[in-house]
């Protein structure tokens, strides 16, 4: 779906570049093969010293195959499409691109971030898409109308700023619950059997 939408965008905006960040870096080979199979040029970020390497043809697609670069990519992006929202796995982090004042596009499955998704939609800092056609329409619209793209990104960032206090309150409440659970843990619960897991 994303590649189809990108190819349609290229027809109107030939300089547009797609940066893909697979959730599992070990999938980079499969993603690269799929992109090449669609007739697009592709490079891995780990093999490009700088994204704007002089003297080399600019690839259509760059696969982010190293950790810790997503924030810098969001900072330079025009629009962000957040994956993991096209299939029922709960969705990925919608706040990162919003923090960097980028319009946030995402699919219908946002179980892990329902409130954030709703707040983004209400602020018109984010939009839900369900099909390749809908994604294409939104991408083309935002590229065709940069002023709308900027306004939408600012709305996304404003939503994050307005809700920072609520986010901290939620984190504090979770911390209190964890302390309470730890203090009341059953004696039959051995060390390490109740792990706190955090992930993106």
Which functions belong to the PLM regions below?
Residues 1-200:
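Nucleotide-activated sugar donor-binding and catalytic core shared by glycosyltransferases
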């Amino acid at each position: 779906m994303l590649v189809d939408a990108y190819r349609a965008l290229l027809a109107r905006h030939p300089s547009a570049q797609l940066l893909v960040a697979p959730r599992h870096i070990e999938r980079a080979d499969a993603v690269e093969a799929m992109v090449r199979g669609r007739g697009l040029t592709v490079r891995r970020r780990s093999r490009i010293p700088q994204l704007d390497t002089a003297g080399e043809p600019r690839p259509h697609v760059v696969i982010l195959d190293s950790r810790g670069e997503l924030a810098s990519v969001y900072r330079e992006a025009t629009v962000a499409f957040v994956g993991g929202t096209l299939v029922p796995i709960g969705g990925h982090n919608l706040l990162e691109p919003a923090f960097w004042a980028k319009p946030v596009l995402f699919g219908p499955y946002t179980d892990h971030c329902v409130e954030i998704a709703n707040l983004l939609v209400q602020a018109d800092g984010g939009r839900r898409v369900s099909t390749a056609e809908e994604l294409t329409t939104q991408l083309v619209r935002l590229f065709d109308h940069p002023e709308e793209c900027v306004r939408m990104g600012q709305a996304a960032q404003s939503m994050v700023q307005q809700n920072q206090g609520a986010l901290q309150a939620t984190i504090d409440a979770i911390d209190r619950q964890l302390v309470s659970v730890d203090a009341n843990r059953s004696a039959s619960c051995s060390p390490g059997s109740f792990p706190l897991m955090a992930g993106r």
